[in-house]
Amino acid sequence: MSQQRENQRGIVSQTTTTTASPILKLRAQERQARDVSWDANVVDNEHLNKKKTKICCIFHPSDRNCDEEDSSSSSDSSSDSSDNEEDDKNTKIAPKSNNNKKKSKPNAYEVQPHYKNQSKVPGK
């Protein structure tokens, strides 16, 4: 707000007053701790041996096919120099014996766990 006043001598004086704008401070109420409580009718599905719908498939390579493919791809990429050809002739891959073949085991996602303490569904 501005006011002007003139004295008897002809001098003009100006008085300016400004008001500070109010500051609004907001504070949230204190929250209560959240607690989870289960009703007596809630069914425990954790230990009921239910099959999972999302099973992760992990690739189990066949025993000898992967080794043969790896060795053939590495020889294709070699250059035509005589040093590399001599090295290729001297290094031979030993054939795998069938005695060491192990039956591949399913991974942890493919096996259904066996629980000792199974919950019972009410009404059954």
Swiss-Prot record:
<dbReference type="Pfam" id="PF07491">
    <property type="entry name" value="PPI_Ypi1"/>
</dbReference>
<feature type="compositionally biased region" description="Polar residues">
    <location>
        <begin position="1"/>
        <end position="21"/>
    </location>
</feature>
<dbReference type="GO" id="GO:0008157">
    <property type="term" value="F:protein phosphatase 1 binding"/>
</dbReference>
<feature type="compositionally biased region" description="Polar residues">
    <location>
        <begin position="115"/>
        <end position="124"/>
    </location>
</feature>
<comment type="similarity">
    <text>Belongs to the YPI1 family.</text>
</comment>
<feature type="compositionally biased region" description="Low complexity">
    <location>
        <begin position="72"/>
        <end position="81"/>
    </location>
</feature>
<feature type="region of interest" description="Disordered">
    <location>
        <begin position="62"/>
        <end position="124"/>
    </location>
</feature>
<dbReference type="GO" id="GO:0004865">
    <property type="term" value="F:protein serine/threonine phosphatase inhibitor activity"/>
</dbReference>
<dbReference type="InterPro" id="IPR011107">
    <property type="entry name" value="PPI_Ypi1"/>
</dbReference>
<dbReference type="GO" id="GO:0005634">
    <property type="term" value="C:nucleus"/>
</dbReference>
<feature type="region of interest" description="Disordered">
    <location>
        <begin position="1"/>
        <end position="38"/>
    </location>
</feature>
<feature type="compositionally biased region" description="Basic and acidic residues">
    <location>
        <begin position="27"/>
        <end position="37"/>
    </location>
</feature>
<protein>
    <recommendedName>
        <fullName>Type 1 phosphatases regulator YPI1</fullName>
    </recommendedName>
</protein>
<dbReference type="GO" id="GO:0030447">
    <property type="term" value="P:filamentous growth"/>
</dbReference>
<keyword id="KW-0539">Nucleus</keyword>
<comment type="function">
    <text>Regulator of type 1 phosphatases which maintains protein phosphatase activity under strict control.</text>
</comment>
